[in-house]
């Protein structure tokens, strides 16, 4: 059996997150989804047809990044998220939901989309004018990797961030293709609840974007 060794420092980096500064909470009002859209990487490779001889989706994970400037002093922030594929979310380079590994878990790829909502107040820089980075990585999962057929074409991410400011006002930031940057990259090559996760610890996660990132595209597959 082929084995690999991951340095302990890499493991420590992988598990450090906002917890206990972030926690899973009840979902926001479902009507807020209307202020967002599914987004994908524009040039992501696409496999279609039947999966033969154990063929996998192309290596690599879809990454999405947005920088948001505080419009006032932040009192609280709640982030409602979902993905087409196995996904993880980050705030300012730290995991905001690592307790929910391999999200969304066992779901029907053609019928069900589970959302995961987190209070991320403790992850944020809170001063007026300060900026926070929100990021998501979405691998193929069952959505576009092998089961029998490659169901979806591209991994996608959708989210709604609701920020409450100290003056009592609220602002909703939904995923929009023209406001988020996207690219294929990161250390995760594949992830699925049966096959587990393939992770290259030599690769630095692009929590804050990078030169390869371009404007995301809208995804209307689901």
Can you describe what each PLM-predicted range is?
Residues 8, 21, 46, 206-207:
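Generic low-complexity segments that are intrinsically disordered, proline-rich and/or Lys/Arg-biased
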Residues 23-72, 82:
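Solvent-exposed, flexible loop/coil segments flanking beta-strands in beta-rich domains
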Residues 203-222:
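Catalytic cores of secreted or luminal carbohydrate-active enzymes
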Residues 1-5:
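Positively charged n-region of N-terminal signal peptides that target proteins for export
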Residues 54, 59, 64-202:
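Accessory beta-strand-rich segments of carbohydrate-active enzymes
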Residues 16, 48, 167:
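Short glycine-rich loop/turn motifs that provide flexible caps or phosphate-binding loops at active sites
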Residues 7-15:
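Bacterial N-terminal signal peptides
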Residues 15-25:
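Bacterial Sec-dependent signal peptides at the C-terminal "C-region" and cleavage site
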């Amino acid at each position: 059996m082929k084995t690999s060794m991951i340095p302990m420092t890499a493991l420590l980096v992988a598990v450090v997150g906002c917890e206990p500064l972030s926690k899973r909470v009840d979902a926001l009002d479902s009507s807020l989804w209307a202020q967002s859209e599914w987004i994908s990487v524009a040039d992501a490779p696409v496999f279609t047809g039947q999966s033969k001889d154990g063929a996998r989706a192309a290596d690599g994970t879809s990454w999405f990044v947005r920088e948001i400037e505080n419009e006032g002093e932040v009192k609280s922030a709640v982030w409602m998220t979902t993905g087409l594929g196995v996904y993880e979310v980050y705030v300012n380079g730290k995991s905001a939901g690592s307790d929910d590994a391999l999200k969304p878990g066992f779901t029907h790829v053609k019928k069900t989309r589970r959302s995961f909502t987190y209070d991320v107040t403790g992850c944020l820089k809170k001063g007026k004018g300060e900026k926070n980075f929100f990021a998501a990585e979405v691998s193929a999962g069952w959505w576009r990797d092998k089961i029998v057929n490659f169901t979806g074409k591209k991994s996608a991410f959708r989210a709604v961030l609701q920020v409450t400011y100290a003056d009592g006002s609220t602002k909703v930031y939904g995923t929009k293709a023209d406001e988020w940057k996207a690219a294929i990259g990161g250390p995760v090559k594949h992830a699925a609840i049966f096959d587990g996760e393939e992770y290259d610890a030599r690769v630095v996660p692009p929590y804050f974007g990078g030169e390869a990132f371009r404007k995301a595209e809208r995804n209307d597959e689901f």
